[in-house]
């Protein structure tokens, strides 16, 4: 879980575009965040298994 100060800092607009980085909207994790969903891989997998992300299902081939 991200610190409250980091979450507040991330919500502020950055002065330069290079200062912006993705962070999970649900848990605040900074790594392996899918831009399309704004979720980290852990949260994305959890929500997909629960069926809360429309159109996403487990792949099998």
UniProtKB/Swiss-Prot annotation:
One of its GO terms (molecular function) is zinc ion binding. It comes from the Bacteria. Transmembrane segments: none annotated. GO terms for biological process: translation. The keyword ATP-binding does not apply. Its cofactor is Zn(2+). PROSITE patterns: RIBOSOMAL_S14. Gene3D superfamilies: 30s Ribosomal Protein S14, Chain N. One of its GO terms (cellular component) is small ribosomal subunit. The keyword Zinc applies. Keywords: Metal-binding, Ribonucleoprotein, Ribosomal protein, RNA-binding, rRNA-binding, Zinc. Zn(2+) binds at residues 24, 27, 40, 43. Binds 1 zinc ion per subunit. Pfam families: Ribosomal_S14. Belongs to the universal ribosomal protein uS14 family. Zinc-binding uS14 subfamily. Part of the 30S ribosomal subunit. Contacts proteins S3 and S10. This is Small ribosomal subunit protein uS14B. The gene is rpsZ.
């Amino acid at each position: 879980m991200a610190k409250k100060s980091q979450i507040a800092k991330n919500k502020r607009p950055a002065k330069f575009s290079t200062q912006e980085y993705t962070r999970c909207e649900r848990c605040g994790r900074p790594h392996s965040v899918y831009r399309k969903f704004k979720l980290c891989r852990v949260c994305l997998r959890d929500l997909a298994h629960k069926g809360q992300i429309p159109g996403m299902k487990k792949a099998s081939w």
